[in-house]
Structures are given as structure tokens and as C-alpha cells.
């Protein structure tokens, strides 16, 4: 269920965020009616609240609270498939898990190092990410997905290796916060492709062999600590298709 269009964040690689402005939000009333109709006519029991960054909706807390109350005691679950690291909080986590069904949570730091995140204008700190995943883990989630990009402008090997270090820190923080070793995260890597109408539209792409080299380095770095590496899933696209 699309709850709004547009984005004001201005990530330099994101075409959708540039060409779908201005932000246009659906009201809580409209969303509630569309959810009711969708559940009635589709037969599905999971409601995904979609947008470029669903937690940025100005009424997302009240929206999730209202839907959670409306479908309390049923098998209907709520999810936010696309969530900004700095917009997710404990209140939102509690609303999403009210019925006891915790669907997937995906966060997109995009870059492994703070330097590369500044380059792409993704102003998310490591502290923000750790605090966010700890909030998820302590509210009952046992797995989160982290999305990154490889081949970004000015990227070096070290920027990619920082993805592995960040994933290790996520697992360590989750285990420390919950006292459980049943904590997992999936690292998903997509290749950077310049898009028209973005600040990076004329940026060159790295050669496929460079991308593949960095993906191999990342896999080795994730598995360099076997205790942590076993808790981290790793998904990526080869350099050539990108």
C-alpha cells in the first residue's frame, strides 16, 4: 500500500527521489480504507506500507497505531519494507509487532564508511544504525536486512571493507542487548548505476572486474571472524550484469 510519493532527502544516486517531488502524502483515513479494501479483495494477511521511506510520513506513528488496533487479534501483520535508519524508533517497533508477527525490516545505509555516505549525501551515522538495529532486536526481531551499494563515485576498497566491520558491529550489539546468540543480519549489495536527472548522472561506473574484486574482499572480511560471520547472510549482484 503506497502511503506517499516523493522524498526530500536528496540522496545523490536516487532518481526516484529527484523526479517524484514534491512529497504527496495519503491521509490516515484514505490509507485505512485502502487497507480494508485490499485485505477484503486480495485475501492476503500482510500489509506493507510502501514509499521511498515510509517512516518519513508525518503521521506514520498514528497510522501504524490505528492499523495495529484495528487488526488486533487477527492474523494481519504490518511491515515497513523501506525504512530510514534515523526514522525508526521504539514506538514504531512496538506498533509493528503488536500482533506478535514480526515481518522483515530493511535498512539502507548504502555506504559502509562515513566518508562514502557523505559523498552520496546519505547522512546516517554508525551510531544511528547501531541504535536502530538494537531497538529492533530488543523488540523481538531476530533478523534485519542491511542494503549497501558497491561502485559508488570515489569508492575505494576500504569503503567496501567497512561494510563487513559494520555488519560485525550490528551482530555484536544485538547479542549484547538481547543476551541471545540467535541474532542475524543479511547484507545485500547492489551495484551503482548512474541515473539520469541525479547529481551522479555523469559519474563513471567501475569496471566489472573492480566490482567483483571488491565483492570478494567483502565476503572474505565478513567471514574473517567465524563466530560473527555465521550470523551474517551475504547477497550480491555480479559486476557484469550491473
For each feature predicted by the language model, list its residue ranges.
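Canonical Radical SAM [4Fe-4S] cluster-binding loop centered on the CxxxCxxC motif
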Residues: 1-29
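Auxiliary Fe-S-binding modules of radical SAM enzymes
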Residues: 40, 137, 160-242
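Conserved SAM/AdoMet-binding glycine-rich loop
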Residues: 36-186
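A short, flexible beta-alpha/helix-coil linker loop
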Residues: 17-21, 112-114, 151-152, 194-197
Amino acid at each position: 500500500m503506497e502511503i506517499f510519493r516523493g522524498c526530500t532527502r536528496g540522496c545523490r544516486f536516487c532518481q526516484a527521489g529527484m523526479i517524484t517531488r514534491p512529497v504527496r502524502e495519503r491521509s490516515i483515513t484514505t490509507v485505512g480504507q485502502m487497507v480494508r479494501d485490499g485485505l477484503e479483495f486480495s485475501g492476503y494477511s500482510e500489509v506493507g506500507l510502501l514509499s521511498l521511506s515510509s517512516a518519513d510520513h508525518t503521521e506514520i506513528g498514528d497510522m501504524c497505531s490505528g492499523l495495529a488496533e484495528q487488526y488486533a487479534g487477527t492474523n494481519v501483520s504490518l511491515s515497513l519494507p523501506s525504512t530510514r535508519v534515523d526514522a525508526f524508533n521504539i514506538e514504531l517497533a512496538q506498533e509493528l509487532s503488536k500482533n506478535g508477527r514480526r515481518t522483515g525490516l530493511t535498512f539502507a545505509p548504502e555506504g559502509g564508511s562515513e566518508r562514502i555516505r557523505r559523498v552520496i549525501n546519505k547522512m546516517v551515522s554508525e551510531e544511528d544504525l547501531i541504535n536502530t538495529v538494537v531497538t529492533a532486536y530488543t523488540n523481538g526481531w531476530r533478523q534485519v536486512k542491511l542494503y549497501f551499494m558497491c561502485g559508488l563515485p570515489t569508492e575505494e576498497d576500504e569503503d567496501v571493507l567497512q561494510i563487513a566491520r559494520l555488519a560485525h558491529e550490528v551482530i555484536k550489539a544485538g547479542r549484547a542487548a538481547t543476551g541471545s546468540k540467535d541474532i542475524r543480519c543479511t547484507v545485500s549489495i547492489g551495484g551503482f548505476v548512474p541515473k539520469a536527472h541525479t547529481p551522479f548522472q555523469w559519474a563513471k561506473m567501475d569496471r566489472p572486474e573492480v566490482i567483483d574484486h571488491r565483492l570478494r574482499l567483502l565476503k572474505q572480511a565478513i567471514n574473517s571472524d567465524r563466530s560473527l560471520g555465521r550470523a551474517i547472510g551475504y547477497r550480491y549482484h555480479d559486476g557484469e550484469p550491473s
